[in-house]
């Protein structure tokens, strides 16, 4: 059975929409989810890898990673080492994500991995069973991750600072 890229991308996009809706519920302004598209040529796939954005919040890019793992918070996430992104995918991005949002496909619980933790990321190989290939990935430990609400607070603080009139 071959990997169904379109189905996986569509499912991923639905989690982008869900995370964006939660951000809006918390009052985060200027939350935008780009339209869902499928790249079908080699050039289009390469362009999508470089330029795709899951969620944009006032110019900041958030990347959503949905996993079929059960967790209710960062504290009970079942793995000690967390896959951030593929090395190829991250390194090709023209605009690096401000943060990654991890979401459980089972519970909808979330936590954030700030890209400012990049210096603490390590590299390792995984075997992607769905695609039947080995992939080099970036990993981070839980201590460099943050509860989702902390990301919300940072985004709200940024919005409030931008809304304040400039002192003259």
Describe the residue ranges of each PLM region.
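Nucleic-acid endonuclease domains
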Residues: 1-61, 65-168
């Amino acid at each position: 059975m071959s990997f169904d890229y379109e189905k996986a991308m569509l499912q991923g996009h639905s989690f982008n929409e869900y995370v964006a809706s939660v951000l809006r519920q918390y009052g985060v302004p200027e939350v935008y989810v780009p339209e869902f598209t499928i790249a079908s040529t080699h050039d289009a796939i390469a362009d999508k890898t470089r330029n795709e954005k899951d969620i944009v919040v006032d110019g900041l890019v958030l990347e959503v990673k949905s996993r079929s793992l059960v967790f209710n918070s960062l504290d009970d996430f079942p793995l000690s080492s967390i896959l951030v992104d593929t090395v190829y995918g991250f390194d090709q991005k023209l605009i690096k994500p401000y943060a990654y949002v991890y979401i459980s496909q089972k519970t909808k619980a979330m936590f954030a991995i700030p890209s400012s933790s990049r210096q603490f990321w390590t590299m390792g190989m995984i075997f992607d069973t769905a695609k039947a290939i080995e992939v080099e990935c970036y990993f981070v430990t839980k201590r460099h991750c943050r509860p989702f609400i902390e990301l919300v607070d940072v985004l709200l603080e940024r919005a409030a600072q931008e809304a304040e009139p400039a002192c003259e």
